[in-house]
Amino acid sequence: KALTERVQFDSTMSAIDAGDYLELPEGSSAAAYMSDGSTMEEIFVVSCKDKTDASAVKIAMQELLDSQTQEAGRYQPEEAERLNNAVFATYGTCVVLCVTSDTDTANAVIKEYVG
């Protein structure tokens, strides 16, 4: 939630069910937000029970990101660029994807929570 409040987004962000977009391993918890507008901005934060599950979630997120980037490349090249520059990393058992132009703030907020 801190990401939605402190990072600059071009569109309004609304909570979504991460399970609609990713297959979540048993025992994991997730928070996700997507843009209400015509941007590809989004946030996925998935906390997994172990690093094996986190690796599987990261692969699934990469596939989602790749497919969105390919789609955006056809119709919204500026959004494809934003997707290519997304903050996307695993911190222990937590996988974070944040698509925004404000990557510096996103990285700072994430570091506060994951160390």
Predicted regions and their residues:
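Soluble, non-membrane globular domain cores that form compact, hydrophobic packing
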Residues: 1-115
